[in-house]
Amino acid sequence: MCGIFGYLGEKNAVPLVLEGLSKLEYRGYDSAGIATLVEGRLFVEKAVGPVSQLCSAVSSDIHSQAAIGHTRWATHGEPSRFNAHPHVDMDASCALVHNGIIENFQKLKEELEEQGVVFSSDTDTEVIVQLFARRYKETRDLIQSFSWTLKRLQGSFACALMHQDHPEVLLCAAHESPLILGLGEDEVFISSDIHAFLKYSGCTQTLASGELAVLRIGKSIETYNFELARIQKEVRCIDHTEDSLDKKGFDYYMLKELYEQPEVFERILHLTCEENGFTESFLKGFSLDEIQSLHIVACGSSYHAGYLAKYVIESIASIPVYVETASEFRYRQPYIAEHSLAILISQSGETADTLAALNEFRKLSKARVLGICNVRESALASRVDHCLFIEAGLEVGVASTKAFTAQLLLLILLGLRLANHRQVIAQEDLAQAIQGLKDLPNLTRLFLDSSIHDWRCRQIEETSFIFLGRRFMYPICMEAALKLKEIAYVEANAYPAGEMKHGPIALIREGTPVIVYCGDRSVYTKTIGAIMEVKARKAYVIALAPESNRDIAAVSDEQIYIPDSHDLAAPILFTIAGQIMAYTMALQRGTEVDRPRNLAKSVTVE
């Protein structure tokens, strides 16, 4: 997984590509590289570590009209200079950058080795450029050789290629992996992420799966399918801003994005709610008739959002909800009943496992598919029957904060909309719920401005934490435990509070930190019972509870109080508490908050 960035135009390509790579670094950051042409010959520079290392290695005297670059998150071959992209052929005449996994790379590699090709890396990517180079030597036809190469690849990929015989041309292609073109005046950008070139262009074309593009200086983009049939593509121009890439005085993107949550909530509520009901635009054109079950499919944090949605929607809309991990869904031959609705959740809209699950849904049933994502230009948004956007703006921190809580809010609103459509919720209860959610932005600001940021973990030297919650709080505990793993590198596990006695209580010893979420009023006393169980075994209990439940201090070692709220808003506020706790513990442990080891923001490979 990685970020791809390329430039072709009248300006100096090298600093533009280095700048673009810096903006893509959150997608992969174990190594980086750039390729360009200097005096008619290919020039390639690579560096292990952040893009700043690459910038230091590249001379500022290099001027070129074309360049391609890459930030890497290793999937084939360890992080190293020789495995970093761009990769070149044996003659160093062409260079290629690639995102994805080539599933038949071993077979292709053996075929090329039999023809005398010597490989210089452990990656599947090098197979592509060596295969292309062999074909180009035979045909001397740049575009035909590229098409022929692409058709031999199995797997998911996006790539960009340059050849020293054609200094005015860049080639790029996409197959089940994102690639976006930005169009300026006599210039074009190639990127894995639209935000990397928005400073220069808001006019875009997105390569669909199975498409390649030929870019030439001063000429319009030529788009083809892999059989070289010409495709006419529309240019989409959007309002664009770079504000999201500015930390705005915060030390970390994660902290900035934590504080942006109230504004995100306000945007969602403005688009979906009015008075005591819903706006006409919310789910406009998407019928909720005859839906008899929901299948929610997602990965990571989005899966936890779906898990909460199951609890909420079943309780308020009286409809069965099944939640699936996307990476498992496609392999287990699930039964999809008639009149089911599939809901696929992905922040980026490019999560490979989730897109694969979408393909599986299409094969298994005629169920309609609703998408929930953050990126309008994404593959998910283009392939589902209807898409709800979480309006979170660019999220740079690898550990999701505002995107996750935006998913929660939108899913809760979807549950209320469904309950109202099915006439299983009293109008008074609906009005109270909507008002409770409308209170959420101000309650979030109140909490973010409270003493929560003074909290420090007294058990920071412990290597294992347990999270407990019941009902709505259990999925939120799952997310809190994930956050601790992601950025503090601490082993953390979440359990339903009632399950402790069925096994996990064996892990409790004196001083074991147990973080208990006591935010669901309907099971508050039951949750207190779980606290008593672990306290009897001398666990160290950190209790999170509403402000009105200060009696929790009598049975816990530490307390974090959350503003009182409506039952449907509470999971979101308790989520934010978990985000702040994980952030604080990461600082205490000295880990990298925005770029945790081994993780990438957008998981575009299976």
UniProtKB/Swiss-Prot annotation:
It catalyses: D-fructose 6-phosphate + L-glutamine = D-glucosamine 6-phosphate + L-glutamate. GO terms for biological process: carbohydrate metabolic process; fructose 6-phosphate metabolic process; protein N-linked glycosylation; UDP-N-acetylglucosamine metabolic process. It comes from the Bacteria. Residues 2-218 form the Glutamine amidotransferase type-2 domain. The gene is glmS. It is found in: Cytoplasm. The active site is at residues 2, 601. Keywords: Aminotransferase, Cytoplasm, Glutamine amidotransferase, Repeat, Transferase. PROSITE patterns: GATASE_TYPE_2, SIS. Its EC number is 2.6.1.16. This is Glutamine--fructose-6-phosphate aminotransferase [isomerizing]. Homodimer. It is an enzyme of class 2 (transferase). GO terms for molecular function: carbohydrate derivative binding; glutamine-fructose-6-phosphate transaminase (isomerizing) activity. Residues 278-424, 448-596 form the SIS domain. GO terms for cellular component: cytosol. InterPro entries: GATase_2_dom (IPR017932), GFAT (IPR005855), GFAT_N (IPR047084), GlmS/AgaS_SIS (IPR035466), GlmS/FrlB_SIS (IPR035490), Ntn_hydrolases_N (IPR029055), SIS_dom (IPR001347), SIS_dom_sf (IPR046348). Catalyzes the first step in hexosamine metabolism, converting fructose-6P into glucosamine-6P using glutamine as a nitrogen source. Its main location: cytoplasm.
